[in-house]
Swiss-Prot record:
UniProt record, GO biological process: diaminopimelate biosynthetic process; lysine biosynthetic process via diaminopimelate
Listed EC numbers: 1.17.1.8
Species per Swiss-Prot/TrEMBL record: Shewanella piezotolerans (strain WP3 / JCM 13877)
Entry binding sites for NAD(+): G11, G12, S13, G14, R15, M16, E37, G101, T102, T103, A125, P126, N127, M128
Protein name: 4-hydroxy-tetrahydrodipicolinate reductase
Gene that this polypeptide is encoded by: dapB
Function: Catalyzes the conversion of 4-hydroxy-tetrahydrodipicolinate (HTPA) to tetrahydrodipicolinate.
Length: 271
């Protein structure tokens, strides 16, 4: 039997953190070695499995990666951009691989993480669902065939608690389409419309955002021409799809050398 990959999960008490703990419990290739919470949390010492509602896992919540340094090989991080950069810095200093599912990074933060990847293996992906990564491949085909003469819009929806907009997945959709069409997304993106906007510029890629209720994640790319339109949609009904993808990424990453990877490489959709 192949040795299981030992993982640590940051933000263990959050919605996504608890789902990641549950996914680790269910995955035969993964062993939860540590669950990290912020300093001062009242959950210190609580069993991570009990916290996630999946039964005891004999892993107590701790407030420091330093305390867990010998307990894991791959860190899984779905926290905040600022925290993720700090955690990646720690991993680079301690020779630990890291899977980053956080979104909302600015350019400077992405550059920092890229620099750390020269020292350790990193998977960084705005969405780890298998279906979403397949969708990005489909968007390449759609953009090649219809993109030059269609109006392109990206519509995304998430729960009321999501802090960044548009979502990282929506931005990646725009990047895939823009790159396929030879455009610069920073120059052609339009984020929301209001007032008298004038006739639509055919070279633009529009973004619309919904934040409501408990929507886990819905993304649609619209290619609209006169007389027909194509819609490519992905809907997530559970955070578990992201968590399972993160476990798959951690297992794959444990066998890689230093470098910055994405989920499409994990899934074998690109080299």
């Amino acid at each position: 039997m192949t040795e299981r990959v030992r993982v640590a999960i940051t933000g263990g008490s959050g919605r996504m953190g608890r789902t990641l703990i549950e996914a680790a419990k269910q995955n035969d290739a993964i062993l939860l070695g540590a669950a990290i919470e912020r300093a001062g949390s009242t959950l210190m010492g609580v069993d991570a499995g009990e916290l996630a509602g999946v039964g005891a896992m004999n892993v107590a919540i701790t407030d420091s990666l330093d305390k867990a340094v010998d307990d894991f090989d791959v860190l899984i991080d779905f926290t905040s951009p600022e925290a993720s950069v700090i955690h990646t810095d720690w991993c680079a200093k301690h020779g630990k691989a890291i899977v980053i599912g956080t979104t909302g990074f600015n350019h400077a933060q992405k550059e920092q993480i890229s620099a750390y990847s020269e020292q350790v293996p990193i998977v960084m992906a705005p969405n780890m669902a298998v279906g979403v990564n397949l969708m990005w491949k489909l968007l390449e085909v759609a953009a090649e065939v219809m993109g030059h003469y269609s109006d392109i819009e990206i519509i995304e929806g998430h729960h009321r608690y999501k802090k960044d907009a548009p979502s990282g997945t929506a931005l990646k959709m725009g990047e895939v389409i823009a790159e396929t069409l030879g455009r610069d997304l920073e120059k052609c993106a339009v984020y929301g419309r209001e007032g008298i906007t004038g006739e639509r510029d055919r070279e633009t890629i529009g973004f619309a955002t919904v934040r409501a209720g408990d929507i886990v994640g819905e993304h649609t790319a619209l290619f609209a021409d006169i007389g027909e339109r194509l819609e490519i949609t992905h809907k997530a009904s559970s955070r578990m799809t992201f968590a399972n993808g993160a476990m798959r990424a951690a297992s794959w990453l444990s066998a890689q050398g230093s470098g910055l990877y994405d989920m499409q490489q994990v899934l074998g959709l690109k080299e």
